[in-house]
A protein has these predicted regions:
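Glycine- and acidic/polar-rich repeat regions and solenoidal domains
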Residues: 1-179
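Surface beta-loop-beta hairpin patches that serve as ligand-binding interfaces in beta-rich domains
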Residues: 171-247
Length: 247
């Protein structure tokens, strides 16, 4: 969908509907991707956000019903090339992925993708010094939140909540179970009802996050997801028709 090719760029408050591909941080470091809506609508090849390079921050995004996997997962971390040429893939380092909501995606999180044509995958460089924290993941039945996890990766998981999925394997440290969000907003977001106890209070792993996808926070703490239920009306919404300019 978008291929970033330089450093320090920001992608925010966009709505992607049934788009084949991903928002890919292809070249460049220290980019921010936040406050975006990705609606796959069950269309083949729809993806989310792919990380390549150093120092990226991906937060407060809503990703739902995406049918892509591997490099077109909802959120994926690319394997890097040793001594990568400018046209290659640089190792993912120091990324923070936090406060995202991932709903009913074929492949929610994939860590260590893109090794199909590598010849010897063991020579590729895994993501290191990364954090995945305070994300809410509602999995499809029988599918785990981590669709792929390169065993060499250095990624710390903290405060993530997972609904549904599979009982075949226990959740890793840094992920625990929760109830699935069941209410639908006018623009198509699945969320917890106001009467439902809010998801757990977030850990302090992304101190740079001061608002949420709908607008400024309505309290002194953050919930584990891209939004926060409160009495404060949101100021941002996903586009709901081709002529809307609310985002």
């Amino acid at each position: 969908i978008i291929s970033n090719k330089s450093c320090g760029n920001t992608y925010r408050h966009n709505t992607f509907v049934a788009c084949s591909g991903t928002l890919t941080l292809r070249h460049g470091n220290r980019c921010a991707v936040y406050g975006n809506w990705f609606f796959g609508n069950g269309q083949k090849g729809t993806g989310g956000i792919r990380l390549i390079g150093e120092g990226h921050r991906v937060y407060n995004n809503y990703l739902a019903n995406l049918e892509g996997d591997d490099t077109r997962s909802a959120i994926s971390f690319q394997l890097g090339l040793p001594d990568s040429p400018p046209s290659g893939y640089f190792q993912v380092k120091g990324a923070i992925v936090a406060f995202n909501t991932i709903i009913d995606c074929k492949s929610p999180l994939a860590i260590g993708v893109g090794d199909e044509d590598a010849g010897d995958p063991s020579r590729l460089l895994p993501p290191i010094d990364c954090v995945i924290a305070n994300n809410l993941i509602a999995c499809r039945e029988g599918r785990p939140p981590l669709a792929r996890m390169d065993a060499r990766s250095q990624i710390r998981l903290a405060g993530n909540l997972v609904a549904g999925g599979t009982d075949a394997a226990p959740l890793p440290e840094g992920m625990r179970g929760t109830a699935a969000p069941t209410e639908s907003s006018p623009e198509g977001m699945r969320r917890h009802a106001a009467a439902t106890p809010a998801p757990a209070t977030a850990t302090a792993d992304a101190p740079f996050v001061h608002d949420h996808i709908d607008g400024p926070p309505g309290g002194t703490t953050r919930d584990v997801r891209c939004e926060q239920l409160s009495g404060v009306p949101g100021t941002r919404r996903a586009l709901s028709d081709p002529h809307s300019t609310r985002a």
